[in-house]
Amino acid sequence: MPQKNIIVKGAREHNLKNVDVEIPRDKLVVFTGLSGSGKSSLAFDTIYAEGQRRYVESLSSYARQFLGQMEKPQVDYIEGLSPAISIDQKTTSKNPRSTVGTVTEIYDYLRLLYARIGIPHCPVCGREISRQTVDDIVDSVLELPEGTKIQVMAPIARGKKGQFVKELESAKKDGYVRVRVDGIIYDLSEKIELDKNKKHNIEIVVDRLVVKESIRSRLADSIETATGLSNGILLVDVIDGEEKLYSLDYACPEHGVSIEELEPRMFSFNNPFGACPTCSGLSVFMKPDPNLIVPDKNLSLRQGAIKASGWNNADGGTIAQMYMEGIAQKYGFTLDTPFKDIPADGVDAIMYGTKGEKLKLTRKNEYGTGSYMTAFEGICNNIERRYKETTSDWSRAELEQCMSTVKCPDCHGARLRKESLCVTVGGINIDEFANKSIVKAIEFLDSLTLTDREQMIAKLIVKEIKDRLTFLRSVGLGYLTLARSSASLSSGESQRIRLATQIGSSLVGVLYILDEPSIGLHQRDNEKLLNTLRNLRDIGNTLIVVEHDEDTMRAADYIVDVGPGAGIHGGNIVCTGTAEDIMNCKESITGQYLSGRKKIPVPAKRRKGNGKSLKIIGARENNLKNIDAEIPLGEFVCITGVSGSGKSSLINEILYKRLVTELNGAKKVAGAHTDILGIDNLDKVIAIDQSPIGRTPRSNPATYTGVFNDIRDLFASTAEAKARGYKANRFSFNVKGGRCEACQGDGIVKIEMHFLADIYVPCDVCKGARYNRETLEVKYKGKNIYDVLEMTVEEGLEFFSSIPKIKRKLQTLYDVGLGYVKIGQPATTLSGGEAQRVKLSTELSRRSTGKTVYILDEPTTGLHTADVHKLIEVLHRLVDNGNSVIVIEHNLDVIKTADWILDLGPEGGDEGGEIIAQGTPEQVAATEGSYTGQYLKKLLNDTEE
């Protein structure tokens, strides 16, 4: 009898406290709980890890060495486990060749469609090129009215310069009598002299006929002869009518442009047969940008106007100085002339070189002064050459700071060679199809009319493409295009794309584990996602969804609530059952919010701001429709709108990149816009995202917030440390001296197991304490440095209550809801939400200038409603300090607490990019046509009740 439940016994991974849980199979199961409660530890690090490990174990040891080996999770046993597929948010491809089309494999089917039924056209004149047999040509000619006089001719030259003496002589020897040169018939016995500098059209007259059925055989022979003379091209001159051009190959009869046999690889931008030769199929390339090389044109060369690596020191006898002095002397300026006042030809010489013209360079050293003549290649050309030649990633990154991305001038961003782009299906080429939104692409396929032969060939291909496009639309991604780069997708979008791909595979009996699939999805599209999840369940799969979204919880068959708190306060199963059961569970924080017993309140009154604002004029990046947007300062501002409406384009691509360049001195190229007014009201911009605070276990909340420096100073000031002569660096695990050298301060040692997963074991010498014995002998209030790092923030607050400097920083960590996190917890073990809150606490602990703008993109990702409550309080504290906070968000609990909302839409993709509503939440809720307003209105009404 098949197992009805997945049974987990004794799960102890991370903070899980010997958890036992039964999960029904073939159901939609939601794992919920506070951020850091242990949901992901149970779902991904225990259940998925064991499912994956068991599958890998079934392979041979030879095959296993090529796969990422998975350590056995800390669990007694798991029963009823199916093969597991994880769809998380961390595997977004950053490969510039990866697109929505390639990730979903729709583009593979599309290439096959164009290769099988595509109609090639001449890249020069756009004429349709079709391959015809001799019989096809004969049938076509005999369709002319009977009695029509025709000449069968072989074009041996079309628009070519030359005298063609050999060709004409050869035709005469072969017995041909007439030739037509530039439209005039000549007898080959005549002397024909051509101007070799002019382009000529030459056709040999092979036969002259009168159309009637009896000439079929003779016509076929003449056609074969003519095409043999002219590489498969034939011209039939209809006397007193139009000429007809035919080709036996895929070649333009007029221009002779030949197209090879259509194959799927011709339409792949990852294959040299299809990729544009200029950009190698990338659609863009890096090019030196004069505006990034000289960002501040008010500076002179001596003041360091040039920021390019190797050219940023025009003083002190450097090579750069010698070249700049040579150019200055030649073009009539000095090294002290502001860059904006340098003559245009001087600027051109600095950027693009002297075009072979030599400069006089003077070299001064201790032996005297010498001069020599040399040409200058120009800074732009120098950067371009070094970029191509270097093999160092560091050098490439350094040079890229002075380069911007430009669209390929040959393929104009289409990635393919021109011959491939001249093949159409339904009147459009493959790039035009890939640039249609998914909704428009489905409409195009529905209206596509094909011949019976094409229908027979393409029926299955079109069905596969349409099914996959429909799956993408069903998960709320109808606004995306197949040409969209994977690197530009949000984590939620890329996760839903992989979800749609899984639906397309139609596997059954699989355990799917998903990580917040609703992230980045507007409430309007939530029902589509839920239907997709239900469909996956209904065909016979088990779904475990780690989720905080209330709609998803209500739609679930079963909920597992992990908690009750986070970190050391979590790791238990609070309750399990239906949404109703969770709501009735008094211990469940989730149940309290789900039932409405707890709510995030709406502020009693909205802030009016400081009267200043940022005005973005003419925003037209991606799908933005040349809009003007005003964002008030000194307020909590939410940017809302359905997925793909243009929120990230407006804030991340235009506003943030412009602000970070002007205020922070970064080298970013802002998205297309006319101007931004009001930047002088700010002094810095900070983007707080969910990226890790560090990539190694050496990074932790203490090192990131800077409190570790204060703690080390405190230990160095103890009597014992002073007696031993220990300074603060003695208490660092990153440098030699105080750390344990056996593990170099890591506390753990890696043991390579080759065919098995590598094992990390506590260091034999320090037993995981990271420091040597002498360092650990120094104590403050009975605790050594290791004991302090092992304390939670909550414990640390009490321990350091008499040290204001340390207490203040720990207090802000506690205030953002991280009281349960260890002071020295490795950054690699923090969730995205936790990392974000560490960053927020660091900002809160800084002295406020009141002129900072904070930008956050979906900060509620991974956060439980209780965590969202804390996050909102922190963000409002930043605004209370006089700063401005701009948040891109779909979470209505955050949106309802905003002072000001800017709602974009009305739809996603091409149908978005406009401002639909702006104002307070109450004003937006009253705006017809705003999807955000519709859901906000309901929530505001519920809250008032």
Where are these regions (language model features)?
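Conserved phosphate-binding elements of NTP-dependent enzyme cores
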Residues: 1-945
